[in-house]
A protein has these predicted regions:
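PPIase-associated folding chaperone regions across multiple families
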Residues: 37, 127-174, 178, 217-317
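Peptidyl-prolyl cis-trans isomerase
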Residues: 182-220, 248, 252
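C-terminal motif of bacterial Sec signal peptides marking the signal peptidase cleavage site
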Residues: 23-26
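Sec-exported extracytoplasmic/periplasmic mature domains
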Residues: 52-56, 87-106, 117-128, 138-156, ...
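Extended intrinsically disordered, low-complexity coil regions enriched in Ser, Thr, Gly, Ala
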Residues: 107-111, 161-166, 171, 188, ...
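Short linear loop/turn motifs
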Residues: 110-121, 202, 210-214, 292
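Bacterial N-terminal signal peptides that target proteins for export
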Residues: 2-13
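N-terminal targeting/tethering segments
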Residues: 28-132
Length: 317
């Protein structure tokens, strides 16, 4: 089926990957077309859904004591910073939802059926109305769909060469004479390169996973010229001498993951060029009162952290 999706991750990662926009700033006169602050933008139940998901995701990993901890140099607590991130996400979601209206991007009957099933499952975890869950998932899905449709004409392809990941083993020494001696040993028939490097390398790390990039420095750059099981010549860099052996000239799994990551980055950058001018015209602010009943230090009986993970289980590749 023709399904759209965002990359799985934290709320901040979702916000950055989908929108790549920092918290909207500035006060004073509202620009023409700007959405006014209003409590009705989201219900308290919808805000609790996102807040509970993020609160519990962190608390399930760490501890409930973290909310009062000072998290930056300005004296903000971890709770206040996370609320700011949640607010940013909800504001951006509202902007892209309005963009979808103007672009005529709507949900199909199949989309509605999928989202209805998703909402029914989520209701088992949260004490909110079905309408609140449906509305929030619709906004989230349509924002996802808007990003996909508005970037589908862009060149987002990433080549295997661009995403290439390799595995190497490396000997590092501070003497050319020593390096020449070790290269002779490593070049002998049936020599054990791993054993030689473990005994002689000055760096305790001997295995490296390298990602190709145009700005690679030595000795990383030379490693990409090696074939599988090939041993390099001596490479000198900043008074150190390196000998490398290519263990895997094309790490298929790691390359595929990186290719997906780079494609998502291109997609984010392409959408950002569309989103930023639009966001300047239609800004959104949540009313400050929406946080009055949201207390991260309370709610120990609720451990739901799956608003986003459940979404991705429905709308994945």
């Amino acid at each position: 089926s023709n399904k759209y999706r965002m990359r799985q991750g934290t709320l901040l990662a979702v916000s950055m990957l989908l929108f790549c926009i920092f918290l909207l700033s500035g006060c004073g006169k509202l620009p023409e077309g700007m959405l006014k602050q209003e409590k009705e933008l989201y219900t308290q139940g919808q805000i609790r859904m996102i807040a509970a998901t993020e609160r519990n995701r962190y608390q399930n990993l760490y501890t409930g004591q973290l909310w009062s901890v000072t998290a930056d140099g300005q004296g903000n607590t971890f709770e206040s910073l996370l609320k700011s991130q949640i607010g940013q996400f909800l504001e951006e979601l509202a902007v892209v939802d309005r963009m979808a209206d103007e672009q005529g991007i709507q949900l199909t009957s199949q989309d509605e059926d999928d989202i209805n099933n998703l909402a029914e499952e989520y209701l088992a975890y949260m004490q909110v109305s079905k309408d609140e869950v449906l509305d929030l998932y619709r906004k989230y899905y349509r924002a996802d769909k808007t990003v996909s449709q508005m970037t589908e004409s862009k060149n987002l392809e990433v080549s295997d060469a661009e995403a290439k990941v390799i595995q190497v083993e490396r000997i590092e020494t501070d003497s050319r004479e020593k390096a020449e001696e070790l290269l002779l040993q490593a070049s002998e028939e049936k020599s054990d390169f791993t054993s030689i490097e473990e005994k002689n390398s000055l760096n305790s790390q001997i295995k490296f996973q390298l990602e190709w990039g145009p700005d690679l420095k030595e000795p990383d750059r030379s490693a990409f010229a090696l074939e599988a099981d090939e041993i390099s010549d001596i490479i000198e860099k900043d008074g150190r001498f390196y000998i490398q052996k290519c263990v895997n000239a094309y790490d298929q799994q790691a390359t595929a993951l990186r290719k997906e990551r780079l494609a998502q980055k291109k997609k984010t950058e392409a959408f950002q060029k569309i989103y930023l001018p639009y966001q300047e015209k239609y800004r959104v602010r949540l009313d400050g009162d929406v946080w009055e009943n949201i207390d991260f230090s309370a709610g120990e009986g609720c451990n739901s952290d799956n608003f986003f993970s459940l979404y991705h289980s429905y709308f994945s590749k």
